Curated annotation (Swiss-Prot):
PANTHER family: RIBOSOMAL PROTEIN S15P/S13E (PTHR11885), SMALL RIBOSOMAL SUBUNIT PROTEIN US15 (PTHR11885:SF6). GO terms for molecular function: small ribosomal subunit rRNA binding; structural constituent of ribosome. SUPFAM superfamilies: S15/NS1 RNA-binding domain (SSF47060). Keywords: Ribonucleoprotein, Ribosomal protein. InterPro entries: Ribosomal_uS15, Ribosomal_uS15_arc_euk, Ribosomal_uS15_N, uS15_NS1_RNA-bd_sf. The gene is RPS13. The keyword Protein biosynthesis does not apply. This is Small ribosomal subunit protein uS15. Belongs to the universal ribosomal protein uS15 family. It comes from Zea mays. The lineage of its organism: Eukaryota, Viridiplantae, Streptophyta, Embryophyta, Tracheophyta. Gene3D superfamilies: 4.10.860.130, S15/NS1, RNA-binding (1.10.287.10). GO terms for biological process: translation.
Length: 151
């Protein structure tokens, strides 16, 4: 699936291994991996950053193959999951940065247009997360309070 507001089709993606068992060379236990995940989350890292950290520094290719559950599910079990889903959080962060830019550069028409696209993505994603009950039904994106959500 391609990016929402672009021309490309976006066909390339990484191939997941067929075997869902942990690699034979990996000697880390599931409890140790969960402990690493909770430590990283307490430091304030997002689930995707935790996955990159485990892959690059500890050599754990897939958390699900080792522990049996994904990073976000482990964080929810320990009460460390972010209140706003990660992709929505970063879209809000981008919208806040564009608004800050537009305060300094009022005539930047391209940024105004990009802000409209980003905010439409935010509204669409928020609608999806309300439907799947990952956000409360009363949650609403407002540009005036967005900077407090990201801070």
């Amino acid at each position: 699936m391609g990016a929402m507001h672009s021309r490309g089709k976006g066909i390339s993606s990484s191939a997941l291994p067929y075997k869902r068992t942990p690699p034979t060379w990996l000697k880390t236990a599931a409890s140790d991996v969960e402990e690493m995940i909770t430590k990283a989350a307490k430091k304030g890292q997002m689930p995707s950053q935790i996955g990159v950290l485990l892959r690059d520094q500890h050599g754990i290719p897939l958390v699900k193959s080792v522990t049996g559950s994904k990073i976000l599910r482990i964080l929810k079990a320990h009460g460390l999951a972010p209140e706003i889903p990660e992709d929505l959080y970063f879209l809000i962060k981008k919208a806040v940065a564009i608004r800050k830019h537009l305060e300094r550069n009022r005539k930047d028409k391209d940024s105004k247009f990009r802000l409209i696209l980003v905010e439409s993505r935010i509204h669409r994603l928020a609608r999806y997360y309300k439907r799947t009950k990952k956000l409360p039904p009363t949650w609403k994106y407002e540009s005036t309070t967005a900077s407090t959500l990201v801070a």
